[in-house]
Structures are given as C-alpha cells and as structure tokens.
Amino acid sequence: VKLGLAVAVPCGAALLIWPAFFNGYPLLFSDSGGFLHQTLEPLMLWDKPYVYGPFLHAFHWRISLWGPVIAQGLILSHLLWLTQRVVRGHATPLWHLGLCAFAALATAAPFSAALLMPDIFAPIVVLGLFLLGFGGAALTRFERGYLLALVALGIAAHLAHLPLALGLCGIALLLRLWRFPVRLFAMALPVVVAVAALFVTNAIGHGRVALSPYGSVFLLARLQEDGPATAVLKARCPDAGWYLCAVTDRLPMPANDFLWAPDSPVNRDATGKPRFLGGMMLAPEAGQIVAEALRANPLGVARAMAGNMAVQLMSFAIGDTLDAAHFAVAVRPRIEQG
C-alpha cells in the first residue's frame, strides 16, 4: 500500500498540473505577484490575507516557482487518494490514476492546481472537510492532524473559503440532527483555527483584530455598481462629508474599475491627485456607506446579490489580466526580485 501511495500520488499530481507542463512554467495571475511580494519584502498587503504568500515561500525559497505548483498538485492528489480510501474502504493506484485523469480532463481542477493563486484551496477545503467529517476510522491520527492544518490554511488563504466552510459545516449540522454519523467538531475546528489565524495576522500586520480590516471597500465597490450604495451617496451627500461626495457624478461605475483603475475615485481624488493606498484610506467611510445601504434597501441588496450570483454561475471567461502589461507591472518584478 505504501509503495502504491508513493508512486500513485506523484503520478496523479503530474496529471493534475498538466497545464503548467504544457505552458512550460507555472500559470500566473496578476495577483500572484502580490502574494510573492508578501514574503520577498516582507509586506502586509491591505487587500490580501497574509497566508498564501508564506505558503508559496515555503516551497519556492527564492529558487523556483515550480516548487509551489508541484506542492499544490501533490496536496490535491493525496486528498483524492484519501477520499478514495474513505469512500471505497481502500485505495488502489489504478483507481487513483483514473480519478486524477478524469479530474484532469473533465474538470477545471488542473487549471487551479497549476495556477499560483489561493483558489486551489477551494477544492482542498471541500475535500478536507468531507474527510474530517466522514473519514472516521479510515484515517490515522496523523492524517486527521494534517487535514486539520491543511483545511485551516485553505480557509484562511482566501476569505471566500470561510463562508464555503461555514456552509458545509451547516449541512453537516443538519445531517447530525437527522442522526447521520458525522464528526461535527472535527469539521468546525479548522474554521476556528483559520479565524484565529486571520485575527492574529491582521492584528500584527494592520493593528486591527478583524477578519478583513479593509473588506468594506470591496463591498462598497460591488454595491455602488449595483446601485444601493450609489443611492445612499446621492441621498446623503454633501451633508455626510464623505470623501466620495466629491465624485458622486462619476458613480456608479464597474466595481473592478472602482477598485483598481488608476483614475478611479479610489486612486485619484477630485482634483486629479493620486491617492497612495486609496482603498485602504477609504475603508472607514466604506463601512458606513455599506451599512447604510443595507439598512435603507435590504431587498435591493438581496436582489443584486441573487442576480450577480446567477450571472457568475452562467458566465465563463478566460484571460483576465493575462496580458503582458499586467505581468510586466505586477509579476515580473517579483520574479526578478526573487
């Protein structure tokens, strides 16, 4: 069994990261440079948890980015091995390679595994929580400890994984109420560890005990495009005295432009002066505006959320920020620095 594991898991990993081999290099996104920046300086970025950057550093050590992508492939392959063992009662190399080949050819898994972004932890969190909740005696004590640490890392690495994990724990709670055997505490523990890790890293790096010290800016970006936040601004300005009162004539605008465009109100004031770390500076009033939008028009916010979810589920696109200009600014300097 150990020999089969030692052979099948690396072979499965190779299948799961085939896009990197096809590309001749790990796949990169413009944000990959930011995560590399976290440990190369080091630097606490206002818009990203200080989690995935250290994970990358643990495997590249300023030598090669192939280390992290191979690690991601091995982690995912090993979780599929454990899942097979829990579901079937045992795991075999042939079944494992077949499962990895199916995932590599019929799902988006290889494009996440070959990409240096924390998105890879979404399937890792799902599989890990399943194993913790339903693995039972099929897992050793070491494997349960490993899964606890891995799932906690995955939840903390991307804030979207926290509601995902909470939702899965909620389903497990319902199953437990229906007398279905599930280890609810084992599933909840990595969520608690992840939340604690976010509190600690943000307290150290930003001086604020919070899950996302500046997350209100992202909510504002979304709600001003959808309308509820823009309605609040136009109703309350100029009396509210908010910074954005000076630019209400430019709103709403696409959320992505609001956050990142060099000439957006976030990054350049009404006089044309650049605002360094404009998103970070906007956070206090962003929280106030979002709170007022939720109070004033909760149904409108809910409708916008449902509509955005439907659009996202039905819309598919590739190549976002994969042009040379983005890489020249965001990624290449970090690779050269390493």
Name each region found by the language model.
Residues 111-121:
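Short acidic/glycine- and proline-prone juxtamembrane loop motifs at membrane-interface regions
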Residues 21-35, 43-55, 59, 63, ...:
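Extracytoplasmic catalytic/substrate-binding loops of multi-pass membrane glycan-assembly enzymes
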Residues 66-97, 101, 105, 124, ...:
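Transmembrane-helix motifs of polytopic, lipid-linked glycan transferases
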Residues 2-27, 104-105, 190-202:
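Transmembrane signal-anchor helices characteristic of membrane glycosylation enzymes that use polyprenol
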Residues 124, 160-175, 187-191, 212-213:
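Transmembrane-embedded, aromatic-rich helix segments that form part
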Residues 144-158, 190-198:
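Membrane-interface alpha helices of multi-pass inner-membrane proteins
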